[in-house]
A protein has these predicted regions:
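Long, basic N-terminal domains or extensions that often function
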Residues: 132-134
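Active-site pocket-lining/capping segments in soluble small-molecule metabolic enzymes
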Residues: 1-119, 137-141, 146-236, 241-332, ...
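Conserved nucleotide-cofactor-binding alpha/beta core module
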Residues: 122-123
Length: 750
């Protein structure tokens, strides 16, 4: 019987998920999980939850699905040791370092590969299975037939998202939020750049605004029969940041369909859809399940938040609690002050924002809504979006009052937060009537649950010592990466020590079909593989590898576990690409065990972290990117034809470029990442391989000359970004100091 897996972002959602029939729940604790903005579980709550859920014959999974920096590995070790003692049914992992640490020290912990690991083909799933990962959460971007193909080619357990919010970017590959301030999606700190309001300018010069990258919500309830017949092991509902009411209603609908579709497929699905009508989330989509028509899941006119649209605030007025007098504020001038007030996006309680002052002199603000089809009632939950997109706040309506308008007709005014203003949009999240009480899962007395992570020391891990011939294929010097053969010719006069060229539709045609001449020998070329590798790509790639190898191309840059599997036991040399994340020494060690000895830095990393991972001669294994226009969004579809713009800007005026190609769509920043002026310092501290990444960029000789001149003179380039190079990831969790004492040694390469 397939498993129904529901989210538990807090204890109330846990109660709802179990109460509505989920077979398993997944939850996070206060760190190392990809939803740090949800409430998550305290240590005693988690221990109680594991005990209680197991008594009910159900399962509980813990998210450990973020990348981990080197200075966090000891805290990770203590956390895994704690989980090993508590005994959840599995942990969800993204970082290869977590996999390596579990393999070494905690073999009892069952591992599931998070969707953030970007496993999207049978090759990737089978490689991870051999590494001890029992289940893989497949990438959301897969089509139905691709899921069926993977099922037919692996014995591993497969988990599929069937309902909830979507990321516009391919799983685990979004850099946008991190670029904007270090709040990385790979660290559970995503600020949802895809949900933001952007201004565009078309080729004709017309300016428009919209939510251009905010996808609708996934709903595959009518595809449950197909997925069940395919043999999917677990049906996953997204929503660790959603309310208990949402979790309960969605879980109930999918429970019903899973239990009854064999009796009456059509009628059961129809009933399930009716049950989902109250989830009050965004408009629904099958996303890419049936094909890649982006116009069906991107709607620039739809606000990035969830809920049923209730209209805009047409007028506001205030009323003192003790006096029944009301003062209308119908002019734009009256709202000028509150328009500039900051609105929290973290969902503050209504009582904290409802009025000013206290007691009999307290002031309550009321709003008149226009443009919707439903009048909220007292007790309903709403979300208010500021008209300038400066923030959003969730609020429970405290009261509804009737006031006469100019024509002496009674109109309903609802209480709103103090900084709500004319022009703000209002959405219904749930009605008071939806509120449902569930039986408590956790023990009423949590004092008996006292386990917490201890003070264990993480054994020291030494990377494999370098032999003289280990890096013979990876010489010191400057590497230049491009996207086309013509770009190879543009950069060739700069005489890089090696060239890297992306394998894409155009280069496949140039290298394999046309066998075009190159400005260099094939031994000077690395072929870089795209980080997203679904079944269709895997099939093509297997043929490409054979064809290119026969032509003399034997050096590769790999960016997905599938690439490792496809190149295994072939006479090739491999560099780990920037999307095979190596944020800690344990991840490097895991990749060493896959016979990868050279690496490319992730665009999100910092100098401090690289210095901590690689010491002494080990630094010669890491290629440092000095310049790039990093892909902030990587999307598995072409943008809608109506998107007739190349550039767009956010409300701060930062500019970004949108690019659609036969291989997908990309968003790049106007300001490139650059640390070109730091090369000489990096050489002094032992790093000696450097990358100039010009991929997905129109390469011009003049630009290359400027870059190389700055490189050799050690000059900083204007109008560029350091990304996270100096400050690293934003962190809301302070690190605890390590206990004194000497740590033991860990095993090296296995």
């Amino acid at each position: 019987m397939a498993e129904l897996l529901a989210p538990a972002g807090n204890t109330e959602a846990l109660d709802a998920a179990i109460g509505e029939g989920a077979d398993a729940v997944y939850l996070g604790l206060k760190s190392f999980n990809a939803r740090l903005r949800s409430s998550n579980f305290a240590w005693n709550q988690f221990e109680s939850a594991v005990q209680a859920v197991h008594k009910l014959g159900k399962k509980i999974y813990v998210t450990v699905n973020t990348v981990v920096e080197e200075n966090e590995t000891e805290r990770l070790y203590r956390f895994l040791s704690y989980l090993d003692k508590i005994g959840p049914d599995a942990i969800l992992v993204q970082d290869f370092g977590v996999v390596r640490m579990v393999q070494e020290f905690f073999p009892r912990l069952v591992m599931h590969a998070s969707t953030q690991m970007n496993a999207s083909s049978a090759a990737a799933v089978n490689l991870l299975s051999k590494e001890g990962i029992k289940r893989v959460v497949l990438a959301r971007e897969l089509q139905g037939e691709e899921i069926r193909s993977i099922r037919h080619n692996t014995a591993s357990e497969l988990e599929v998202f069937v309902h909830g919010a979507l990321c516009v970017s391919e799983s685990g590959l979004c850099l946008f939020s991190s670029y904007l301030g270090g709040k990385s999606a790979n660290r559970g700190m995503c600020t949802q750049a895809c949900r933001r309001y952007y201004e565009t300018e078309s080729g004709a010069g017309a300016k428009e605004k919209g939510y251009y990258f905010s996808p609708n919500d996934l709903q595959l309830i009518d595809r449950i029969p197909f997925l069940a017949e395919t043999g999917v092991d677990s049906f996953k509902i997204e929503g660790r940041m959603k309310s208990a009411e949402y979790v309960g209603s969605v879980t109930a609908a999918y429970r019903y369909v899973l239990d009854h579709w064999r009796e009456d497929k059509e009628g059961t699905v129809a009933a399930g859809k009716r049950m989902l009508a109250t989830d009050f989330a965004r408009a629904k989509t099958h996303f890419l399940f049936d094909g890649a028509d982006s116009s069906k899941f991107l709607n620039p006119d739809q606000a990035g938040g969830t809920g049923i649209y209730l209209g805009k605030i047409d007028a506001v007025r205030t009323e003192k609690a003790a006096e029944r007098s009301a003062k209308a504020e119908l002019s734009g001038a009256a709202d000028a002050g509150s328009d500039n007030a900051g609105v929290s996006a973290t969902g503050l309680s209504g009582s904290a924002l409802a009025g000013t002052g206290s007691g009999s002199g307290a002031v309550q603000k009321f709003a008149l809504l226009k443009g919707g089809s439903y009048d909220p009632e007292s007790g309903d939950s709403i979300r208010i979006h500021k008209k300038d997109d400066s923030g959003r706040v969730s609020y429970k309506v405290q009261s509804v009052k009737k006031f006469a308008n100019a024509k002496d007709r009674q109109e309903s005014w609802i209480s709103v937060p103090a900084d709500a203003s004319r022009g703000d949009s209002v959405y219904l999240l749930q009605t008071k009537s939806m509120t449902k009480r569930y039986k408590r899962v956790l023990a009423s007395d949590l004092s008996q649950f006292r386990l917490q992570p201890g003070g264990e020391r993480l054994p020291v891990l030494d990377l494999t010592p370098l032999q003289k011939e280990t890096l013979s294929f990876f010489p010191e010097g400057t590497y230049i990466q491009v996207s086309t053969v013509s770009d190879l010719y543009a950069v060739a006069p700069e005489h890089p020590v090696r060239f890297i060229i992306e394998l894409n539709t155009e280069t496949r045609r140039s290298l394999i079909d046309k066998k075009e001449a190159l400005p260099c020998g094939k031994k000077q070329v690395f072929i870089s593989l795209d980080p997203f590798c679904p079944p269709k790509t895997q099939t093509v790639l297997e043929n490409d590898i054979e064809a290119l190898s026969a032509l003399g191309f034997t050096q590769w840059v790999v960016n997905n576990p599938a690439h490792i599997a496809l190149l295994k036991n072939k006479n090739v040399r491999i560099i780990g690409g920037s999307y095979l994340y190596t944020f800690n020494r344990w991840a490097v060690s895991w990749l060493e065990n896959q016979n990868i000895d050279a690496f490319t830095m992730s665009y999100e990393t910092s100098l401090k972290n690289l210095e901590a991972i690689f010491e002494g001669t080990q630094r010669s294994r890491m290629m440092i990117c000095l310049f790039s226009y990093p892909a902030l969004f990587r999307m598995r579809f072409t943008l809608p034809e109506s998107y007739d713009f190349s550039w767009f800007a956010d409300k701060e005026g930062m500019m970004f470029r949108a690019l659609s190609t036969p291989d997908g769509s990309f968003v790049m920043p106007e300001q490139p990442f650059s640390i070109i002026d730091r090369m000489q310092h990096l050489r002094k501290i032992g790093f000696s391989r450097f990358l100039i990444d010009m991929s997905k960029t129109a390469v011009r000789r003049a630009d290359i000359k400027v870059l190389m001149r700055a490189l050799y003179k050690g000059e900083a380039l204007p109008d560029t970004s350091r990304f996270n190079w100096k400050d690293g990831f934003y962190s809301a969790v302070p690190l605890r100091a390590a206990a004194p004492g000497k740590a033991p040694k860990a095993a090296g390469k296995t």
